[in-house]
Amino acid sequence: FVTGEYPVIKDVETAATGLLAALEESDADRIRELVLVDQRTNTVVTHRDVGIGISQVLPVLVMAYGSQEKLLAMEQPEIHLHPALQAELGDVFIEAALGSRQNTFILETHSEHLILRLMRRMRETYQRKEMGLPPVTPADVSVLYVEPDGTRSIVREMPLNELGELVKSWPGGFFEEGLREQFDDA
């Protein structure tokens, strides 16, 4: 990983050319291909051989586990992932934020599964259940809901209590979709 402070780049094209030359001169022999192992079949595969969700989440995992004491902003880190893996991603963020890495995350998500996992871990912390993860409290998680209002957007804080429950009613449309699919008659 690159560390240190660097000046603002004003001429992007010249800087990119210089970086490419430096990469070709010093790092070309160290570049490796990432391979994965399908645990069901014990088969080695590349990121190109797996679903798009797995290849999309790899940079998220690298940033979460490869960074320390950083502010990391991610847009829809759960995109194209199976719902169970979206929930597991919640545990990744808990570990990377509240464990030894101490990262801070700003996540833009549409995933009920990811949010529900954070809420569950908060409840398990309060109930003193062993999770194998750092404890999660309401002070550790801030849920913001952004909704359009004409030509502007309104940001609403949606606080959680120690049981991981929403203190305020959720604005319409988010958690309602799953309930509507389960219980509404057509």
Residue ranges and their predicted role:
Residues V2-Y6, A15-A22, S26-Q182:
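Switch/communication elements of ASCE P-loop NTPase nucleotide-binding domains
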Residues I9:
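Conserved helicase NTPase catalytic core signature
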